[in-house]
Design a protein with these regions (language model features):
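Short, intrinsically disordered, charge-balanced linker/junction segments flanking boundaries
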Residues: 337-346
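Internal mixed-charge
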Residues: 334
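Hydrophobic/aromatic interaction determinants used to assemble and anchor large protein complexes
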Residues: 317-319
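Extended, helix-rich architectural segments
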Residues: 1-311, 322-330
């Protein structure tokens, strides 16, 4: 797939070379994004409260328990009225679960569809997709929203594909998106803590930056004096990024030096891109790939080719303030699927 990302109208508020990012999110953009997350409607405490009402023994807060004991002189007794009702709804979902079956539009492809159905059944079983969907549905019923990740497994010993539930606290998304699948949303962020040793093992090329950041080891001995350039350029930029980042985001929000952990920000965002498409049917178009012999053959036989403007999904990975990866993808949707129950009109 070849797509030319259109340059942004501005660099998201970049004020220096440290901030700039060619066709991607800068550090300033990440800061603005995180601040935008804080400015969203305050629905998360209500969702946490709804989950607490479902859990056993969490119907009364510590303050209410103390008040009942002291003012009423009785021992508080909690009766969970919603637990059984929700379990009944979840049981109906489990009973109605069925295998995914692929059906061909034409009889001549029936054998192919049978083989694909078998492969789909295997993938569903090995990736525990049914359990992940049930967990996402359960979170949707209890608190209004659930998330499921569909991606490739990073461990070569695991099944190639993984379908796993993701806690709602880890996901932040574009609140302005109207579609239930978020295909009109500009961005989605997943925030999660990672242990330093695992992060370094997966990305050894960033060992020095990650260890210095978690250990807060930007000592004066390792940093250049004014007017000196003895420090490596990458480390110097990392130190400057961390110093600037800490002005707006508290350090304890993304770094745990005691536990040796650092928070990763997995940013998926859409940018305008110009592509060349090949018309393969009245209603179907594909991005033209000049390295694909089938596409080249189709064009030589007279297939129509035209330019179009689309949205390209990029993925940017930050470890705290340190941008590690910013790459384009061929995805048409984010790898995180939302399970919405009701959405507030806000």
């Amino acid at each position: 797939m070849s797509a030319r990302t259109l340059p942004p109208l501005d660099d998201y508020g970049a004020q220096s070379a440290r901030d700039s990012a060619k066709n991607g999110f800068s550090l300033g953009a990440l800061e603005a994004l995180l601040q935008d997350c804080q400015g969203q409607p305050d629905w998360r405490p209500r969702s946490d409260l709804a989950h607490a009402y479902y859990d056993m023994g969490k119907q009364l807060t510590a303050e209410k328990i103390q008040k009942i004991r002291w003012e009423m002189g009785i021992e508080p007794r909690q009766t969970n009225l919603i637990h059984g009702v929700i379990n009944g709804v979840l049981g109906m979902e489990a009973k109605q679960r069925s295998d995914v079956r692929i059906e061909a539009d034409q009889d001549e492809f029936e054998d192919v569809s049978d083989v694909l159905s078998m492969r789909m059944k295997e993938a569903t079983r090995e990736s525990n997709a049914d359990m992940a969907i049930s967990d996402g549905y359960a979170s949707q019923i209890k608190g209004g929203i659930g998330w499921v990740e569909v991606s490739r497994a990073s461990d070569p010993l695991d099944y190639p594909y993984r379908v796993t539930p993701v806690h709602r606290r880890e996901i932040w998304y574009d609140w302005r998106a109207q579609k239930l699948d978020l295909k009109d949303g500009r961005w989605l962020v997943r925030k999660r803590w990672e242990d330093l040793d695992e992060a370094v093992a997966l990305m050894p090329q960033f060992r020095e930056i990650l260890t210095n950041s978690v250990n807060n080891n930007w000592s004066s001995a390792a940093l250049p004096d004014e007017g000196m350039t003895t420090m490596q350029p990458s480390l110097s930029r990392a130190w400057n990024s961390e110093r600037q980042f800490s002005r707006t985001i508290r350090r304890d929000e993304w770094c745990d030096s005691t536990r040796k952990r650092i928070k990763f920000f997995e940013v998926w965002y859409r940018v305008p891109a110009e592509v060349v498409v090949i018309h393969v049917g009245p209603t179907k178009k594909l991005v033209y790939d000049q390295n694909n012999p089938v596409h080249v053959e189709a064009v030589s036989r007279g297939a129509k080719v035209s330019k179009a403007i689309t949205r390209q999904i990029r993925m940017s990975l930050f470890a705290g303030p340190h941008r590690l990866i910013d790459v384009p993808t061929t995805r048409r949707s984010f790898p995180y699927i939302p399970f919405f129950c009701f959405r507030d009109d806000e």
